[in-house]
């Protein structure tokens, strides 16, 4: 909810002055900044009238260049010209090399994080991103006569993980930008179409940008934007189509190894070729390097042949998202196309064929995300009642906690709308337990070994009590940016521990898909394994409780009775270790309960007798 400052008349020169907030599309290839004026969202341009700022930064000993000027130096100075750094956010060097292959950069470590060696020193992807954001902020300030920018909504791919989202926030902080919210790019597109076109119903947002792909299925109704399901791949985008063309050009020219400068030349030519083939059926690509000249003809048919596997990969994500949303293709009213890569005729035709309807492109696919971000920023800064629009994103995978026996207790199920907070109480397993280890997990399976570990932390200072007496309240909170924090508190003392989850390794769409498929194909076996584990845990509890009782009160039994109970314990231990079915252990536990019932009664009688000894009837 936006807060209004109340002042006496005369104290505020313009009590109803429009507050300036901006929406930023921090893209892999290009970035944009937009704002809302007179109720209309519009992108802001530079001195040359260009709205798109190339997401390129060149570092020299004497200074930094951002945007089009930096692009001009990419071929001559590829090592110091950083392109598509968004793809590196929250990634390790090994992940980058595995995903993107040969790159003209020299990676290194700086302050424990990934960086790139440049003439201006070691530059992290976060720092490079901050320079792009700072340039966009400066453009906005210049457009409004240096009026103060009060806040910004910055868009991110829906499948950015916590580390990538936090890196984006860090970059904004370095750029001096107050982040009102991180907004998923497909959701931003829906904001733009929902407000501008008054759409209602189920809409698919197909977002294929320079470096990432997202598919979101949304329900739009009376200003409410609810994401029913999401999918995507944080390592699939227009750059990958460029790489396919680069490989084809290398094949046609007979080149196997490229220097950084020549590689950048090939990439630039490939990108231009791809864009030209959106309008023409044939393009001749001229390549001049190493004192040689080459001319390679590339047809749209050849590009389609190269690109179809990647396009089909995006459609597999679409198919799963539709299934996750619990709908049929026919229920999708509109398909919104977002991102420059959706200009490819192959992409448009394949997506239209998949959803059996013409894709919607009435808003420039390059600008729609920035426009939606600007509209949301206008709401959050207080220029509109926040009841005008509500955004509900969802979790792609369930979040839970490890419990005894290696089981997973799901705290927040997948596809829950965020922001969200859920709490659950747990207790100790052993007498005198003073600490508890908490293991946070992500996934749909029943056992810890089959889920993804996110973080571990400990709660210490639990007062010594009998097993099951302590009450530990564990709270999971996922904020509007998809960042998870987990806290644990022992209720009697208030002792607390917490952690913010920032996993270093992201999940690709394939990994998410595999996790979901495995959970479905193994559902029956997983539940059987869970039931077996639960009975094993219960058997262990019974065994340890009885052994503790015998250690303190064995004097209540004669030798034969004691030997009988120890034999029953040994039998339960054996069944617990060897049983394949939960009912086998359950039957053994019931047998153990019956065998020890007389001993339990004797202990109860002894305890009552001890309490009553020396007491008068009046005292009782």
UniProtKB/Swiss-Prot annotation:
ATP-binding listed as a keyword: yes
Entry keywords, A to Z: ATP-binding, Chaperone, Nucleotide-binding
One Pfam family, short name: HSP70
Superkingdom of the organism of origin: Bacteria
SUPFAM superfamilies linked to this entry: Actin-like ATPase domain (SSF53067), Heat shock protein 70kD (HSP70), C-terminal subdomain (SSF100934), Heat shock protein 70kD (HSP70), peptide-binding domain (SSF100920)
A GO biological process held by the record: iron-sulfur cluster assembly
Molecular function GO terms recorded: ATP binding; ATP hydrolysis activity; ATP-dependent protein folding chaperone; unfolded protein binding
Gene3D superfamilies with a match to the protein in the record: 1.20.1270.10, 3.30.420.40, Actin, Chain A, domain 4, Substrate Binding Domain Of DNAk, Chain A, domain 1
InterPro entries from the UniProt entry: ATPase_NBD, Heat_shock_70_CS, HSP70_C_sf, HSP70_peptide-bd_sf, Hsp_70_fam, ISC_FeS_clus_asmbl_HscA
HAMAP family listed in its UniProt record: HscA
Protein function: Chaperone involved in the maturation of iron-sulfur cluster-containing proteins. Has a low intrinsic ATPase activity which is markedly stimulated by HscB.
Family of this protein: Belongs to the heat shock protein 70 family.
Family matches, as PANTHER family: HEAT SHOCK PROTEIN 70KDA
Record protein name field: Chaperone protein HscA homolog
Source organism of the structure: Pseudoalteromonas translucida (strain TAC 125)
Gene responsible for this protein: hscA
């Amino acid at each position: 909810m936006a807060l209004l400052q109340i002042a006496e008349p005369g104290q505020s020169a313009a009590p109803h002055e429009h507050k300036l907030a901006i929406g930023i599309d921090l893209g892999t290839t290009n970035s944009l900044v937009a704002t809302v004026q007179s109720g209309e969202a519009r992108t802001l341009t530079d001195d040359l009238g260009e709205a798109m700022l190339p997401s390129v930064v060149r570092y020299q000993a004497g200074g930094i260049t951002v945007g089009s000027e930096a692009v001009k130096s990419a071929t001559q100075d590829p090592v110091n010209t950083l392109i598509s750094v968004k793809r590196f956010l929250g990634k390790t060097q090994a992940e980058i090399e595995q995903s993107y292959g040969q790159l003209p950069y020299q990676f290194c470590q700086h302050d424990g994080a990934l960086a790139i060696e440049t003439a201006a020193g070691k530059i992290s992807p976060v720092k490079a991103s901050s320079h792009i954001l700072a340039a966009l902020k400066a453009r906005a300030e210049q457009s409004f006569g240096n009026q103060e920018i009060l806040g910004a909504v910055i868009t991110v791919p829906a499948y950015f993980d916590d580390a990538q989202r936090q890196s984006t926030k860090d970059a904004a902080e370095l750029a001096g930008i107050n982040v009102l919210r991180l907004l998923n790019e497909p959701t931003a597109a829906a904001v733009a179409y929902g407000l501008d076109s008054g759409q209602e119903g189920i809409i698919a947002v197909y977002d294929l940008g320079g470096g990432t792909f997202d598919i979101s299925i949304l329900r739009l109704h009376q200003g409410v934007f609810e994401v029913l399901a999401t999918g995507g791949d944080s390592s699939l985008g227009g750059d990958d189509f460029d790489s396919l063309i680069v490989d084809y050009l290398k094949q046609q020219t007979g080149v196997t190894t490229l220097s950084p400068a020549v590689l950048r030349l090939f990439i630039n030519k490939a990108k231009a070729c791809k864009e030209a083939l959106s309008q023409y059926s044939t393009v001749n690509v001229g390549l001049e390097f190493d004192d040689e000249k080459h001319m390679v003809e590339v047809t749209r048919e050849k590009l389609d042949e190269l690109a179809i596997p990647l396009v089909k990969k995006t459609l597999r994500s679409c198919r799963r998202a539709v299934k996750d949303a619990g709908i049929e293709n026919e229920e999708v009213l509109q398909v919104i196309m977002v991102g420059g890569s959706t200009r490819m005729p192959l992409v448009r035709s394949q997506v239209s064929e998949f959803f059996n309807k013409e894709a919607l492109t009435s808003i420039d696919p390059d600008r729609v995300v920035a426009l939606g971000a600007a509209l949301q920023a206008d709401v959050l800064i207080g220029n509109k009642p926040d009841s005008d629009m509500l955004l509900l994103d969802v979790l792609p995978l369930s979040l839970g906690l490890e419990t005894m026996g290696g089981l997973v207790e799901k705290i927040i199920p997948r596809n829950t709308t965020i922001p969200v907070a859920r709490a659950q109480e747990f207790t100790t397993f052993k007498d005198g337990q003073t600490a508890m280890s908490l293991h946070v997990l992500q996934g749909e399976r029943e056992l810890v070994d089959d889920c993804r570990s996110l973080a571990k932390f400990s709660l210490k200072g639990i007062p010594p009590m009998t097993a099951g007496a302590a009450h530990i309240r564990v709270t999971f909170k996922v904020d509007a940016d998809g960042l998870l924090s987990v806290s644990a508190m022992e209720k009697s003392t208030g002792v607390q521990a917490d952690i913010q989850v920032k996993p270093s390794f992201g999940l690709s769409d394939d990994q998410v898909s595999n996790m979901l498929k495995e959970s479905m194909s193994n559902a029956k076996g997983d539940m059987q394994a869970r039931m077996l584990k639960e009975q094993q845990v219960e058997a262990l509890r019974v065994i340890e409780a009885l052994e503790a009782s015998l250690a303190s009160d064995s004097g209540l039994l004669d030798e034969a009775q004691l030997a009988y109970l120890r034999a029953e314990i040994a039998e339960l231990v054996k069944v617990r270790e060897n049983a394949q079915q939960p009912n086998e252990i359950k039957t053994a536990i019931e047998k153990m309960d019956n065998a020890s019932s007389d001993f339990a009664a004797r202990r109860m009688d002894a305890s009552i007798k001890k309490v009553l000894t020396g007491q008068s009837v009046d005292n009782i």
